Amino acid sequence: MKFNPNLFLAWFWILLGFVTGMVLGLFFRDEHWLGGYGSFQRRMYRLAHISFFGLGAVNLLFWLTAQNVSLTGPFAGVASWAFVVGAITMPVCCGIMAHFPKAHLLFTVPVVSLILGGALTLTLVLHEPQSVKAANTAGPAANHQLSTANSP
């Protein structure tokens, strides 16, 4: 199987979500850790933690969409890397913001990257070639790998 950055990042980010959850969980019983549960610092760490899961899932969904719809061309490549950049920079920005709240403009990088990736993917899905649409609507036998139902 050819290396795909979105698939790799998806599962690596999900793993990091588990690991960061474990690390945060070591300290959650301390009411005053990072300024207490409602503190800005602690909220940013929680946001970084959950972004690993959410953006890992987004990259996995992009990879699955690219496989199912056969996304190709330069816009598909830009969308792919936009999701990777957004996923990598979001938890980094959360960590920086936890300690330097005035650096909030850093969030422009992950937010714009993710919006770009989402907009390009939606555009590509809406304008998928007719030959691919015909293959995808041919019936249940069009994609044997995704089917788990037993045929009668």
Regions found by a protein language model. Give the residues of each.
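Polytopic transmembrane helical bundles with strong interfacial aromatic enrichment
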Residues: 1-49, 53-152
